[in-house]
Structures are given as structure tokens and as C-alpha cells.
């Protein structure tokens, strides 16, 4: 990391300001070549967390006015000397300022290189680095909160608690076994069980957070299904907030799957409005119906729509049967009309039932609550730490299984050496999660998803 790197850190386009970030041992030297403060004070002589207003000059020509923010190592984002130049937000001007910085001795930063340097310099662990990209890409309040809590150490604190407990246990076991001549107190089975049970509870809690975390981060693959003209497209439009699906009184209008992503309460739903489920001789419509039936078997949430003013038919009953195979909310639509539907039968077969008028919006709040309940939002507590990706989940799961192996070894009377092997495997998995012990390939894969300038 001998190079001093630079990149535009704000989004491309025209705006009030743009920020060019420079990081590395020579950050101050590079910037002093092109930044001339109005008080003639060099950035290299300024204290950290201070700012200076001045001119950007290249080849003796003034390019722009700018504010330079100075951060001294190690008290900066990257842990290195950092300068952030805030100039006017024009596309051409911003690129001109960056070119001047590069001409002064900096090199272009790679994607995610600033955050990668923060990781390599011990400012953040790998889970916190992954949280940075999650903050940037968050599509809902819950997703942003969850990512921010991870960035501030919610997952790391849990991992450190388990890691330190297991390290202490393994060290005590090894010392007692290797130095019998020393006056080292023997570890009791009760102490070992306590250590394992506490570790298992914490790791189990993190594993449980994963599904809710994915629901708020990636969204739930959700299918709207029902027979023709029950109001599926109207429901799709209600949730989308716009006329996304065609709404008519003609059965079979929706022949293919229409997709949209919406935020319902604090949950992201990846919605699919499917063809009406019915027996048909129309070849094109039949293809749509077959696709709908296939899709609803694979979804993470089924919104099964029924018509309040029509009696149940065989297609409705087939849908009710499918509802037992996936998480489901039964939506009794058109409640503004006269009742003909056997709602008691539906309530006896499907746990979550919501009464709604998709046309007027009455009942929408109840639908939002039902979606949040199915997504586990009642138990969703970002401050407790939320695993945000499969890499983290697998590392915690591996550690959990190793702790369970250690507990099982104790229960069947294996030696302390055998127990210690499982404990050490559990610790290794946790170190892989934090990045304290992991391959360069894994690290590179994490930062590959970042944008340039972050």
C-alpha cells in the first residue's frame, strides 16, 4: 500500500459539490502541489479534522475553488493520511480536478480500495466492510438500519464475545493438560457446558437473524395468485403505487408474469402478478397459467387472492392447497361488495387472512402488518447484529457446528485434546468471518462489489 490513491467519491453527474478523496503516505504532499489555501498554509502543516478554503491550480492555471478536509493517520477512514477535496459538482470540473491530483503523483484507486485499506489497516473487520456496501445499496429504512448496526460493530461484538470465551476455554484446557506440574485448576464439566451453551445461544441467534436480514436487504420473492378477475392486478397496482398491471373486467388479461419491487412497511417484496388460475383452452393463456403454478411453488411468499362476492370454485380450492406448501397470506378482496365467499373455510385452512378492498385501499394497513409478521419483523432487532450474506452465515454455521461437536465430545467422554480440536475449529470459522484469517481470494471477492471512490 505504498501508493497514494485518488478517486471521485461522489456519484457521477452534475450537483452542488463533488468530492475527490486522496489517501496514502503522500496525500498531503500530492495535494499541496495543486491546492493553494487562502492563508497560504500547507495541508501538511494542518491538524487533523480541519478544513481550508482555497484554489485548485494545475500548470499555473486556476481550475476551481475547493475546500480541503485533512485527516491524519490513523484517525481517518482508511487509517492513512487522507485529504478530501470538495469542488464544484460539474462533470468536467470534477474530472479536471482529479486529473490534477493524479498528475501531482497519486494513482487511480481501484473499486473499493479505500475501504479495503481500512480493513487491511485494522480500522474495520470484513463484516463491517461488507456493511459499507450494504449501507450504500440499502432500499429501505430497515435495510439501512441493519447495515449501519453491523458497520458499528453489532456482529463483530457478538463474534468477539464467542471467540474470547472459546479462546479462554481452549487455553485453560491446554494449560491444564500440558503442564500438570503447575498449580492450574482443573476445568470442570459444568464450566465447559456453560461455555458451550453460551456460545451456542449467541451463534444460534445470529443464524436466526439471517432470514429476516435477507428479507429487508434483498426482499422476498412474492407471487400474487388467484383465479381471473379476483383483483390481482389491482392489488399489484395498490402495492406498487402506480398502474403497473392492466386492470379490466375481461378474464385472462394478464397472460404472462408482471414483476415489480415494492416496499411494504419495512419489507421489500419482489412482486410477481401472475395469470389467473383457471382451466382454459386458450393455448397462450394456458402457458401463462402453467407458469403461474410453477412460480407459486418456488416463491418465498404467496399472496393468495380470493373474491369476497364469489363462491369458492375448484381453482380456489387448488390454490388453498398450494398455500400449505409456502408462507402464505390469504387476501379476501372486494370487501366493499356483498359476501358470497365461504371465508370460514379459508380461515380454517390458511393461518394469515386479510380482508381488503384493493380498489379503495381499505385494509392495506392490515396487509402491511401481515407481511411484516411473516417476515419476522417483530423479532427483527438490528442492534443485536444481523448476518447480511451467505459468506457470514456459513462461517457462523460452521462455528456453531464445531461448538456442538465439542459439547458432544464432552458428553460421550472424549479426551480434552479431542474437545480442544473442535473448539479451535469453531474459532477458525469466526476468524474467517471477521477476516482475521482468510484467503486473499475471499477478501478480493468482497471488495470486488464496491464502487470506485469507496
Where are the regions that the model predicts?
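Generic enzyme active-site microenvironment
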Residues: 271, 305, 331
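Inter-motif core of Ras-like GTPase G domains
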Residues: 285-309
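C-terminal-of-GTPase-core extension/linker across diverse P-loop GTPases
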Residues: 2-8, 12, 143-260, 280-282, ...
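A glycine-rich (often HGG/GG-containing) alpha/beta subdomain
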Residues: 1-145, 149, 153, 329
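Short, Asp-centered acidic motifs that coordinate Mg2+ and/or phosphate
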Residues: 269, 301, 329
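Short glycine-/small-residue-rich Rossmann-like dinucleotide-binding loops
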Residues: 240, 275-276, 300, 307, ...
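Switch I (G2) and immediately adjacent beta-strands of P-loop GTPase domains
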Residues: 52-63, 68-72, 252-280, 298
Amino acid at each position: 500500500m505504498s501508493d497514494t490513491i485518488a478517486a471521485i467519491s461522489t456519484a457521477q453527474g452534475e450537483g452542488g459539490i463533488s468530492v475527490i478523496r486522496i489517501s496514502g503516505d503522500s496525500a498531503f504532499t500530492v495535494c499541496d502541489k495543486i491546492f493553494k489555501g487562502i492563508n497560504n498554509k500547507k495541508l501538511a502543516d494542518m491538524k487533523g479534522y480541519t478544513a481550508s478554503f482555497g484554489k485548485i491550480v494545475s500548470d499555473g492555471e486556476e481550475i476551481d475553488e475547493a475546500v480541503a478536509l485533512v485527516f491524519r493517520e490513523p484517525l481517518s477512514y482508511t487509517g492513512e493520511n487522507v485529504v478530501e477535496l470538495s469542488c464544484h459538482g460539474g462533470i468536467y470540473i470534477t474530472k479536471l480536478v482529479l486529473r490534477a491530483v493524479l498528475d501531482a503523483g497519486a494513482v487511480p484507486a481501484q473499486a473499493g480500495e479505500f475501504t479495503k485499506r481500512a480493513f487491511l489497516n485494522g480500522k474495520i473487520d470484513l463484516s463491517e466492510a461488507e456493511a459499507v456496501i450494504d449501507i450504500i445499496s440499502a432500499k429501505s429504512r430497515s435495510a439501512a438500519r441493519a447495515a449501519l448496526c453491523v458497520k458499528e460493530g453489532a456482529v463483530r461484538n457478538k463474534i468477539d464475545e464467542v471467540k474470547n470465551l472459546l479462546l479462554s476455554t481452549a487455553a485453560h484446557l491446554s494449560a491444564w493438560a500440558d503442564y500438570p506440574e503447575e498449580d492450574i485448576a482443573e476445568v470442570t464439566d459444568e464450566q465447559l457446558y456453560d461455555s458451550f451453551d453460551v456460545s451456542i445461544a449467541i451463534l444460534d441467534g445470529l443464524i436466526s437473524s439471517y432470514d429476516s436480514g435477507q428479507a429487508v436487504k434483498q426482499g422476498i420473492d412474492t407471487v400474487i395468485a388467484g383465479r381471473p378477475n379476483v383483483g390481482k392486478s389491482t392489488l399489484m397496482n395498490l402495492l406498487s403505487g402506480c398502474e403497473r398491471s392492466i386492470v379490466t373486467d375481461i378474464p385472462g388479461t394478464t397472460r404472462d408474469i408482471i414483476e415489480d419491487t415494492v416496499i411494504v412497511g419495512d419489507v421489500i417484496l419482489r412482486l410477481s402478478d401472475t395469470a389467473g388460475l383457471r382451466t382454459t383452452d386458450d393455448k397462450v393463456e394456458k402457458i401463462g397459467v402453467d407458469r403461474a403454478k410453477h412460480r407459486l411453488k418456488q416463491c418465498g411468499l404467496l399472496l393468495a387472492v380470493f373474491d369476497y362476492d364469489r363462491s369458492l370454485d375448484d381453482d380456489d380450492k387448488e390454490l388453498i392447497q398450494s398455500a400449505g406448501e409456502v408462507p402464505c397470506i390469504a387476501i379476501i378482496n372486494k370487501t366493499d361488495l356483498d359476501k358470497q365467499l365461504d371465508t370460514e373455510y379459508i380461515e380454517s385452512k390458511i393461518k394469515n387472512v386479510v380482508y381488503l378492498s384493493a380498489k379503495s385501499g381499505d385494509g392495506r394497513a392490515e396487509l402491511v402488518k401481515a407481511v411484516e409478521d411473516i417476515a419476522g419483523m417483530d423479532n427483527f432487532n438490528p442492534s443485536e447484529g444481523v448476518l447480511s450474506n451467505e459468506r457470514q452465515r456459513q462461517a457462523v454455521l460452521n462455528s456453531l457446528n464445531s461448538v456442538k461437536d465439542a459439547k458432544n465430545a464432552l458428553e460421550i467422554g472424549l479426551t480434552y485434546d479431542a474437545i480442544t480440536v473442535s473448539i479451535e475449529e469453531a474459532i477458525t470459522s469466526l476468524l474467517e468471518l471477521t477476516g482475521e484469517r482468510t484467503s486473499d481470494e475471499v477478501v478480493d471477492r468482497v471488495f470486488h462489489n464496491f464502487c470506485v471512490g469507496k
